[in-house]
Amino acid sequence: MASSVSGAEEVRVSALTPLKLVGLVCVFLALCLDVGAVLSPAWVTADDQYHLSLWKSCSKPAASATWRCNSTLGTDWQIATLALLLGGAFLILLSFLVALVSVCIRSRRRFYRPVAIMLFAAVVLQACCLVLYPIKFIETISLRIYHEFNWGYGLAWGATIFSFGGAILYCLNPKNYEDYY
């Protein structure tokens, strides 16, 4: 029986490796965590008297039962924090879409490097955001009560860590191990 594909027409099809699939899952998780961090109402909380998010700051005097909220987009460091986090989230979204497209088409290898570069850039942006935020918070806002960085801040760190993991997985040289799968 003759082969339907001649030697000149043979196309190299790269297999989807488990590491790239895990990388795609890492990027998806990073994207979900970033959405949660951006929408979180609690980046800093203080004894049920104060909470700060990326969008608003709310305080409640000890004798009062009502919360007084203000926009946080009035100070430059909070705008910079939000811009860095949203920039990183945009890069993660873009890298997720490129990685998803690479799963659907036959030639995957050419997409590995751009995805890894975008993820490393997102990690740098988000790490800058996550270092800037507590430094400027402690420098500018003086709370005389116990306060802690809450789950919104933790979600942003989780997104950064998953982005870094996905970037590492997309950096692995596929030529060394793709033939084994």
Curated annotation (Swiss-Prot):
Q: Which InterPro entries match?
A: P53_induced, PMP22/EMP/MP20/Claudin
Q: Which domain of life is it from?
A: Eukaryota
Transmembrane segment boundaries: 21-41, 81-101, 115-135, 152-172
Q: Name one GO biological process term.
A: cell-cell adhesion
Q: Where in the cell is it found?
A: Membrane; Cell junction, Adherens junction
Give the principal location in a single coarse category: membrane
Protein name, please?
Transmembrane protein 47
